[in-house]
Amino acid sequence: MYLEDTIAAIGTPVGEGGIGIIRVSGPDVPAIARRIVRRVNENGDFVSHRFYYGTVVDPESRDTVDEVMAVLMRAPRSFTREDVLEIQCHGGYLVTRRVLDAVLQCGARPAEPGEFTRRAFLNGRIDLVQAEAVIDVIRSKTEAALNLAQHQREGRLSERLKAVQGCLRHSLALVEAFIDFPDDEVDPASRVEIEAKAREASGRIEELLEGFDEGRVLRDGVSVLIAGKPNVGKSSLLNTLLQEKRAIVTSVPGTTRDIIEEVVNVRGLPLRMLDTAGIRETEDVVEQEGVRLTLEKIPQADLILFVLDGSRPFDDDDRMILAALAERRVIVVTNKSDLPVTLRIPGELEGVHTVAISTATGAGIDDLREAVFETFIHGRAIDSREYVALSQTRHRDALVKARGRIAVFFANLAAGNDLEILAVDLRDALDAVGEVTGETTPDDILELIFQRFCIGK
């Protein structure tokens, strides 16, 4: 990647649409704009951030390519902090390709995936946390996930990380001051200040780490597998949660043979719901394969909804399923609460969260949604504008490393080890936090991060 060249890409999805957008960034943008954008009733230089109506013309033949709106944004007042040209043309595969080709004929090169965002990062407009949040904004499936991503894109998580870095730099500056003046002893007041700032940094890191599990599930969603014997209402439960008829429901046992997957939004938490084949002993070869797939999926799920028929006794098929759920996160769902209750919950399930529902009447469904939500989001106000959380494993791992280096610092401080050793510990902690924000992130990790982006972003 060369920041001194000019890049271009189509910034809208391929296919028919109302408009297509071609983005161009780099030093040749003003020359490209003058060469291919023919403005109506306008002459002279482009005024920054003003929309112009006109046409894009082929740079060689001067034939009209399309009717467009175009805006040139002068550096540094653009997304990449470079000169940027955005051309809005008619949507469609061929016309957007022709406009892009006109730009490329003027010397621009095709952009790599995520290269516009990468330039914004390398030019200091955003840090790496904000860059990663851009793709999370695009891929968000719920309002809560979008809010979390937007908060990160706006820099709220970055502000908390800067506060951690500020504490560590404060401690490090004091330590290095005494290293520079070896004749001076570390006085008690300075030692207290060094220790206090390091503890504050550690506490701030701990607060961020505590919110990781919730941030991760908001970003990535969780897999929830509906398990149970045939005809207990698993498919009816999926349809009820979806509020549409997605799975076939009949009175014939074994109707569901394959795994059906759908996404359900529960208060902003994306649930990947898996409706599975009823688990039982069977001679049917196809049904056996469905049971095998279900048992294979159980260990991979984040949560199991173990559905029981409240109007029938707990039997051997239920017990076989219970054995497969050992050490899994489970909510017991007793369906058919509108019928006389015959089921007795076995002792092995005592203490497991149980919700009584009726898919026929809808009773208890809101209670079930709340139980699933609280399993992953422990009372936090995820819809609050103040909600900020870690959501990337990369961030969590780097902060765990930073916390570990601070712990080593305290051990060396207590042992009375040399100031140089204490300084190394604090620098290592700072470097670990810098891996999150991009200040010390290795190039190979940067490559992996920006490869996840689409071309044009």
UniProtKB/Swiss-Prot annotation:
Its EC number is 3.6.-.-. Its cofactor is K(+). Mg(2+) binds at S235, T256. GTP binds at residues 231-236, 250-256, 275-278. GO terms for biological process: tRNA methylation; tRNA wobble uridine modification. One of its GO terms (molecular function) is GTPase activity. It is found in: Cytoplasm. Its main location: cytoplasm. PROSITE patterns: G_TRME. The keyword Nucleotidyltransferase does not apply. (6S)-5-formyl-5,6,7,8-tetrahydrofolate binds at R23, E86, R125, K457. Disulfide bonds: none annotated. K(+) binds at N231, T250, V252, T255. The keyword Ribonucleoprotein does not apply. Residues 221-377 form the TrmE-type G domain. Pfam families: MMR_HSR1 (PF01926), MnmE_helical (PF12631), TrmE_N (PF10396). Keywords: Cytoplasm, GTP-binding, Hydrolase, Magnesium, Metal-binding, Nucleotide-binding, Potassium, tRNA processing. GO terms for cellular component: cytosol. Binds 1 potassium ion per subunit. Belongs to the TRAFAC class TrmE-Era-EngA-EngB-Septin-like GTPase superfamily. TrmE GTPase family. NCBIfam families: mnmE_trmE_thdF (TIGR00450), PRK05291.1-3 (NF003661), small_GTP (TIGR00231). Homodimer. Heterotetramer of two MnmE and two MnmG subunits. Exhibits a very high intrinsic GTPase hydrolysis rate. Involved in the addition of a carboxymethylaminomethyl (cmnm) group at the wobble position (U34) of certain tRNAs, forming tRNA-cmnm(5)s(2)U34. This is tRNA modification GTPase MnmE. The gene is mnmE.
